[in-house]
Every structure is written in C-alpha cells, then in structure tokens.
C-alpha cells in the first residue's frame, strides 16, 4: 500500500490529525515526496565568487627619496630609508621608467628652508620651483606634468620654510621616463619625509 493510502486508512480509523503531522515530520524528506525541496536548497548555496577568494595582482609602485650631490643637483635614491621600487619600476639616469602602459598617480614633494636676511643686506627674492617632467618616444623633449613655483623674500623675522606638494593621475606608456627639475636646490631641506618622488599604477 502506498504512503497516501496508509494515511487515508489511519484517518478513516480515527487517528488524530496531530499524530499524522508528527508522522510526516518524522519521515525522511525523500519518503515525504519532498526531495525536490532538498535539491533546490542545495542549488541556492552557491560558493563565493573566485575573485573574492584570491588576492589581487600586485601593481607597479615606486617611492624615491632625494639627496644632494656634489654638482648641486637633486638625485633620487631607491635603496635607503623608506624608498623602494616594486613590480617592474626601475631607476635609470635619475629617471623613473614606466614598466607597463596604464593610469598612474604621480606625486612629488620638496621642502625649502633658509635663514633670515642680515639687517645690512638688501633683501632679494629667492625663486623656488619644482617640476615633474615626462620624456616619451612621442615627444622629442621633456614635457612638464606637474609644476609649482614660489618666491621668498627673506626678512629679519627669522628662518623661513616653504613646501610644495604635487600629485595627479596620468595615462602613461611603457618605456616613458619621469624625472624632475628643481630651482633653489641649495635651499632644499633634505630628509625622507620632506623630499620625495614616486608613482604607482591604478
């Protein structure tokens, strides 16, 4: 006799409905004819997408620290303090070489400082400037990407300090070169947290 026939017989014989409900709950899902429910539940339990289980690809990044040279020029170093070159970036002839084409955030900071003017001296303005330049096969010359200028008039009130920070996003090509040009190098305040230059892929 089928399951439905047995239940009908029990009901005819006066079996309480509560007992029948308990009997149904006690039966396995397959015996209740509800196997489809079990399979539906299994289908909804999807695993997490693969992209959430794996780490992203590490992108190119570089951070350089400035230091003075005997030629009164600003040189960049990648092997000291908190400086680094990662995932394809390289430093050649004081220029950063772009490893792959794409969008990059390029940034640089310089800090200038100086003493106050002597009471007998005639104050003269000091011109300060810092520029990040691009040299590419598409252009026969250095193209300014970031540029900042300031003029300082030393007074009698004491030492002075001026800082310049610049940063923006650029579309660069593999093999492009990033370099800097600075006016007022003799007034640069060299420290890892004051004079730096870098870029990272987005």
Curated annotation (Swiss-Prot):
InterPro entries: TNF (IPR006053), TNF_beta (IPR002960), TNF_CS (IPR021184), TNF_dom (IPR006052), Tumour_necrosis_fac-like_dom (IPR008983). It comes from Mus musculus (Mouse). SUPFAM superfamilies: TNF-like (SSF49842). Glycans are attached at residue 93. GO terms for cellular component: extracellular space; plasma membrane. One of its GO terms (biological process) is positive regulation of type II interferon production. It is found in: Secreted; Membrane. It comes from the Eukaryota. Pfam families: TNF (PF00229). CDD domains: TNF. Keywords: Cytokine, Glycoprotein, Membrane, Secreted, Signal. Residues 60-202 form the THD domain. Homotrimer, and heterotrimer of either two LTB and one LTA subunits or (less prevalent) two LTA and one LTB subunits. Interacts with TNFRSF14. The keyword Glycoprotein applies. The keyword Chaperone does not apply. Cytokine that in its homotrimeric form binds to TNFRSF1A/TNFR1, TNFRSF1B/TNFBR and TNFRSF14/HVEM. In its heterotrimeric form with LTB binds to TNFRSF3/LTBR. Lymphotoxin is produced by lymphocytes and is cytotoxic for a wide range of tumor cells in vitro and in vivo. Residues 1-33 form the signal peptide. This is Lymphotoxin-alpha. Belongs to the tumor necrosis factor family. GO terms for molecular function: cytokine activity; tumor necrosis factor receptor binding. SMART domains: TNF.
